[in-house]
């Protein structure tokens, strides 16, 4: 497992070497403009909390990739679990924000949930078509920021950005980023699957991050894509 730490320095280089959080890299060879959307379902299956999470319980969210043009269709698939492209956990009591068709077709936002007691404590997922494999970690993060002004600002003012690479039991690579910003914390997980780039975000203001650290890291770790059987 490799870890990279991004600090205030003009150097971009290999693992464990600092780079500038303020640098927003140009662009990948593949355009980020094209985006798919998804149709998804939240199951009522409870997930037991891990040690340190108190009595927090979760539901499993299943997302199935579809084009923005097909968003809102419900016909022909009574069990979306069988066609899920990705899953992640949602804390019991969090609310879903319905993503518009325009959002799905432009910036790739696919799903979003938030804490009704503090709406800026949330998790959401975006995905983009046309990515067969991951680029270097710093390039991926910088290109995500190109279409996300809030992420740009968070990186620009961050005290520290840490990244690492993990592989699951099938060998699929996931990039994990932790951004310690001004008054805000963000956990981002990125992977490629079936020619799509998936990015799962968990964001929280500093007080909620300090209070809900275990829950928020659980959400980060729960995200994965679903392989074809």
Swiss-Prot record:
Keywords: Chloroplast, Plastid, Thylakoid, Transit peptide. InterPro entries: Mog1/PsbP_a/b/a-sand, PsbP_C. Gene3D superfamilies: Mog1/PsbP, alpha/beta/alpha sandwich. The keyword Thylakoid applies. It is found in: Plastid, Chloroplast thylakoid lumen. Its main location: plastid. One of its GO terms (molecular function) is calcium ion binding. GO terms for biological process: photosynthesis. One of its GO terms (cellular component) is extrinsic component of membrane. Coiled coil: none annotated. This is Thylakoid lumenal 19 kDa protein, chloroplastic. It comes from Arabidopsis thaliana.
